Amino acid sequence: MGKSAMSKMKQYLAKLDALSPDQTLLKSSKVLLFLSGSSHLDCASLTSGQLEFLEQICPPDFSVVASNFPFNQGFEHERQAQVSLLNASISNIRYYWHTLYNSRFQEALQRHLSPLLDAEEAVIICKSSGLNILTQWLEDLGEENLPYRLRVIALGPVSRRVLNHKDIDLLVIKGSKD
């Protein structure tokens, strides 16, 4: 990994460390959210299509989380970031690697995903390496601490681990090339 890629990740981790848990966007008792790798480390915005999709499928008593990870008001999530496919791919590869092997990033996952433990129900739509992020979080969390009602829809998932908790409703959708 190049020096600039490493420094970008260090800057990203410093931003994650500085975020206040009190500013989490995961405050509702029932949440619907996207979780994916990050194609842009400075912004956690969803595309207008992703946000519209969530709003269209959102059950009446659920709240849409209008951000990707880290799901925090203090992290930019409203500005649309334009990223080339090549740069997005490189960023997602970096994210995947750090999810598995960077203990500081794994601690950030715990810190920023742990508000889900307070939710009555969560529906998480994992795109790409989002399933890898989720399985890493759940492994570090321990099965005895699993959120009560967790539903996962994995779209074109990329994950080192298989999500096989009996208490999780899982739907995997993948194309012939996934």
Predicted feature residues:
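Active-site catalytic motif of lipid deacylating hydrolases and related acyltransferases
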Residues: 2-12, 18-119
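Intrinsically disordered, low-complexity regions
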Residues: 6-16, 54, 90, 127, ...
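Serine-dependent carboxylesterase/thioesterase catalytic core
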Residues: 104-178
